[in-house]
């Protein structure tokens, strides 16, 4: 392993990590994928929970995160904002429909080990940059690392997969 400086850090934009950190992530991912293909189990994420907050529908992103967490011994908890009180900015709260992002981030980070968020387009009224603002607001208040599963500015996990 070249570095472990990315551990415990948010990943919101592709540029949040150095080249060396990205190379390490790719090396670790390749080794874990190889082990999985060979039937070697890993408990790297044993007793770890990832809360996945989806403001937008997803097939590939949701399933890849859920499968990855399961294959590494962890649990991915799916949160569909259409079926829960949707996390929102304090000035955009609607009674019986939403909760403050700050409160949501603090609560989820106390119960889990990471928060992943997908937010863009219709979910934020097609206001350019608001999806990114939602992800960054979660990161501001969370004590656990926040992963951007896609916003209107960045899609770092897809960028990594494209390499």
Regions found by a protein language model. Give the residues of each.
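Positively charged, low-complexity intrinsically disordered leader regions
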Residues: 1-63, 67
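Phosphate/diphosphate ligand-binding glycine-rich loop within oxidoreductases
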Residues: 43-163
């Amino acid at each position: 392993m070249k570095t472990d400086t990315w551990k415990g850090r948010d990943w919101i934009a592709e540029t949040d990590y150095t080249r060396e950190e990205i190379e390490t992530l790719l090396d670790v991912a390749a080794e874990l994928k190889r082990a999985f293909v060979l039937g070697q189990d890993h408990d790297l994420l044993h007793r770890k929970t990832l809360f996945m907050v989806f403001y937008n529908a997803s097939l590939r992103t949701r399933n890849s995160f859920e499968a990855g967490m399961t294959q590494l011994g962890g649990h991915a908890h799916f949160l569909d904002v259409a079926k829960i009180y949707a996390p929102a900015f304090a000035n955009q709260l609607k009674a019986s429909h939403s909760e403050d992002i700050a409160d949501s981030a603090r609560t989820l980070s106390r119960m889990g080990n990471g928060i992943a968020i997908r937010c863009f387009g219709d979910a934020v009224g097609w206001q350019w940059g608001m999806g990114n603002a939602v992800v960054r607001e979660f990161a501001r208040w969370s004590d656990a690392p926040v992963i951007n599963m896609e916003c209107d500015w960045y899609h770092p996990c897809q960028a990594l997969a494209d390499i």
